[in-house]
Amino acid sequence: MMRRDFMRLTAATPFLFSMTPSRAASPPAGEWRTFELVYHIDLAAQKGAGQLWLPLPVDAGDYQRVISVTWKTAPEQAALTWDTDYRAPLFAAEWTPAHTDRQLAVTTVVATRNRNRSPAGGVHVVTPDVARYLEPTTNMPIDGIVETTAAKIVHGITDPDARAKAIYDWVVDNTFRKPTVRGCGLGNIKFMLETGDLGGKCADINSLYVGLARAAGLPAREMYGVRVADSALFNSLGRAGDVSKAHHCRAEYFSPRHGWVAVDPADVRKVVLEEKLALSDPRVIALRERLFGYWEMNWVGLNTARDFDLAPPASAPLPYLMYPYAEFGDIRLDGREPEHFDFRLTSRELTRQT
């Protein structure tokens, strides 16, 4: 990427560059928690020219608000940007072969509050921005075995929310968490259904929910993010301090009654495995019902981008961007393997307002 490309990106995002701590918005009032997330990046071992992309928190309105984004010791060719398709917020940086300092820190301050399903009221229209989440992507086809599986699940059910719940229950009942999967998984749902291997992690299980929902005519999407604090529900559903390995993908579907509705079948399966509980355990039954329409916001959402091109472009599209990603020549550094990519992501709670 050329210097002029970064200059153009910088000029296109002046409002983001003004969000320094002294000028940032105040934390919103009312049951909100404020977190500071810091990426610590060290690419000193990489030689030659290279590029880095970091996913940043998204401003999601009633349950998540970005207060500030700042960085230090970054190269001159660094900017806040977003992809042109999903508008996923990104920090991008480029090093030339002459750059010797390849360490940087990027800090985001973000406020969150627990998300519940909105009360039914009026009719929520499927706008073009919503309708795009009915479409297939490279790793999420909605024809063939995905379509036939969805049709079996929702057979005889016409109400959209009931269809969404039927798919949620099917995913919870038929998948399982596989701890050996790298990172959060790839979300190749066609492969999962064709092989009958429905084991995986959050990007597999929740992507399966999203793909089946789309195939059943329900707009749905993943939200990629990271856990940033301990959970009030189960120990396995929280992480604080060093959250470099605390990434987690969630899901949501669009309801004519409620708008976007939060769901998380993958966390039900995570609790079953890591808390050593059966699906029939009363605590799991309660969690299962709760996570259809609820997100505990000890987690920060990053983006809903799927099978997309980074901005500026990388060598190839990515299935998703939930972790840091870098390219130096033919070397690809994937944050799903932090042992091969010298980065840390830390979280610190700043305030809690009620």
Residue map of PLM features:
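N-terminal export signals
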Residues: 5-24
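A mature extracytoplasmic/lumenal domain signature
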Residues: 56-58, 108-110, 122-123, 224-226, ...
